[in-house]
Amino acid sequence: MLRIPVRKALVGLSKSPKGCVRTTATAASNLIEVFVDGQSVMVEPGTTVLQACEKVGMQIPRFCYHERLSVAGNCRMCLVEIEKAPKVVAACAMPVMKGWNILTNSEKSKKAREGVMEFLLANHPLDCPICDQGGECDLQDQSMMFGNDRSRFLEGKRAVEDKNIGPLVKTIMTRCIQCTRCIRFASEIAGVDDLGTTGRGNDMQVGTYIEKMFMSELSGNIIDICPVGALTSKPYAFTARPWETRKTESIDVMDAVGSNIVVSTRTGEVMRILPRMHEDINEEWISDKTRFAYDGLKRQRLTEPMVRNEKGLLTYTSWEDALSRVAGMLQSFQGKDVAAIAGGLVDAEALVALKDLLNRVDSDTLCTEEVFPTAGAGTDLRSNYLLNTTIAGVEEADVVLLVGTNPRFEAPLFNARIRKSWLHNDLKVALIGSPVDLTYTYDHLGDSPKILQDIASGSHPFSQVLKEAKKPMVVLGSSALQRNDGAAILAAVSSIAQKIRMTSGVTGDWKVMNILHRIASQVAALDLGYKPGVEAIRKNPPRLLFLLGADGGCITRQDLPKDCFIIYQGHHGDVGAPIADVILPGAAYTEKSATYVNTEGRAQQTKVAVTPPGLAREDWKIIRALSEIAGVTLPYDTLDQVRNRLEEVSPNLVRYDDIEGANYFQQANELSKLVNQQLLADPLVPPQLTIKDFYMTDSISRASQTMAKCVKAVTEGAQAVEEPSIC
């Protein structure tokens, strides 16, 4: 772990405030005056020339500089003239001094940039027509704006062998300009020291030295930060140009973080998914599953309603026939004979529609696949099941205790925040659970949940660390709550959090208790009053079961009576569809305007990027049509009316991009004392231990060939999925 060298590279950084990006400015209160092309600007001591220029709206060209990475200063494209200085300086690395007059467009600056650009293009293949970076390439843009109109280089160009670093990132290393952005991203953000440089001068190459897969859950981000076409997307190769695609701002549902994304589509098909800036959630990064699992949206899709015939086979039918059959069964059964299970990719609109439908047939047996303890405060207090500190709040914490979770694969962008704070703010991290590679050092306290009792009682050495902390966080993974002693684990963590608040120097508004969820629908379902887990259905098996996107395999045919009528509504023929008597095809997250609530309780919206395939429809519309045929018509016909209903049930569900602060931690702790469950000695083992467990976790990613290639590459090595380069 290269914590010390990286910190030396980032020397001069102040402690990162909440939600901000890396800056070289110090905490000094006295400002100094500098001039940019004669325009006065006040900046803090330590501000670089480039930052001072940006403060007045002057854009300086750059290739190696990136706001979230350490300064390398090796591309020299940002050269500017300082009045009375003998030579031009690199704007990204030079701190300003009082009274400087920075000349960004002087003849000297222009000639320096032209010279640098000429050197960069000397060995560049200039293969823009067949380069996937074409149209969004920094080298194209800056050579047009700052380069010369001709080259003096007449010798043969350098050629570099391409590297095979796995099934996601395609390399054409002849295009590489050695900006080292990918290397710095890998070591600083992803925490993986797989990439580096070998050789020097004309022989310098970027690669892995020994051919191997770039083993990171964030590897796709090096495609975005590469300023040229050296690193591009393998699945996207030669499929579309950026100006041909339609961009739709949306939300990711592959985990519970709720990363902001842009869905690029062409001719009704998702071509690629890119990150969208959101400082409080994902900054400008997304995980590989978010970025590359989109091909699963085209495979194993349910496109037409299906019913099981007399021979026990599922056959296609019309919407009228399918809905009539389901409505007839709904009219035959009432109350406890009817139950529903909601899966991990279901939106809030569908959840409230299904809840209203079952309530109208006198049933309240609405369950989620994911278990959450109901003993003690359970789900009655919102603070008991949220990441209360917020994702960006990690940057303010000084101690983090992780319990029964592997955030690197359960919530990669949350883990990246922890690593960022660990690098910049000297964050101390401890883990109770199976030892895993989190990309940062931590104190492993053991894997037994009984350690929680020792910490709560104050007998464990780590109790003193928590007591001395000013802003501690205790993060409990939702996977730990799936155990038989989940209620006892939750009660113990609640007790620790409350004791910290009472005995340490924690400020009044700082929240210690945090739950890290893994699936996108869980928080909204709990907000709407769904029962966590399917234990109620196992104890009292229904005669009609509605599976709304339930593909987790939490219940099987063997758990239900032989005459139980099962309806599956969803978008993939995965785990739930084969056991159903009727299948109603729904829309995936890229095909509907829908509300999702992330693990910190922040409501966000997806937008329609493409239309659902075949006869598939949005989930709430299917449920609304079903209610009308069944004679229990739901009182809404439009999306706005459904959201008005959401507001009636839980107002926070329509306060988009806003977090309603949760409270009542003391009351939750008092109620947790009523839990009489005992902690087990079994070790806390998160379900996603290694990167192989990360790629295929839901119906979309399980249908993705790209994710299957990743699993194969991790299992057998990158050579197993090597693809010859066309270029």
UniProtKB/Swiss-Prot annotation:
Residues that coordinate or bind [4Fe-4S] cluster 2: 176, 179, 182, 226
NAD listed as a keyword: yes
Start and end residues of each 2Fe-2S ferredoxin-type domain: 30-108
Subcellular location(s) per record: Mitochondrion inner membrane
InterPro entries for this protein: 2Fe-2S_ferredoxin-like_sf (IPR036010), 2Fe-2S_ferredoxin-type (IPR001041), Mopterin_OxRdtase (IPR006656), Mopterin_OxRdtase_4Fe-4S_dom (IPR006963), NADH_UbQ_OxRdtase_75kDa_su_CS (IPR000283), NADH_UbQ_OxRdtase_ferredoxin (IPR054351), NADH_UbQ_OxRdtase_Gsu (IPR010228), NADH_UbQ_OxRdtase_Gsu_4Fe4S-bd (IPR019574)
Entry's transmembrane regions: none
BP-aspect Gene Ontology terms: cellular respiration; mitochondrial electron transport, NADH to ubiquinone; mitochondrial respiratory chain complex I assembly
Cofactor(s) listed: [2Fe-2S] cluster; [4Fe-4S] cluster
Topology of the protein relative to the lipid bilayer: Peripheral membrane protein
Secretion signal, residue range per the UniProt entry: none
Transit peptide: 1-23
Keyword annotations from UniProtKB, A to Z: 2Fe-2S, 4Fe-4S, Acetylation, Electron transport, Iron, Iron-sulfur, Membrane, Metal-binding, Mitochondrion, Mitochondrion inner membrane, NAD, Oxidoreductase, Respiratory chain, Transit peptide, Translocase, Transport, Ubiquinone
Top-level division of the source organism's lineage: Eukaryota
Modification N6-acetyllysine occurs at: 84, 467, 499, 709
Annotated catalysed reactions: a ubiquinone + NADH + 5 H(+)(in) = a ubiquinol + NAD(+) + 4 H(+)(out)
Domain named 4Fe-4S His(Cys)3-ligated-type: residues: 108-147
Protein name as annotated: NADH-ubiquinone oxidoreductase 75 kDa subunit, mitochondrial
Organism: Pongo pygmaeus (Bornean orangutan)
GN (gene name): NDUFS1
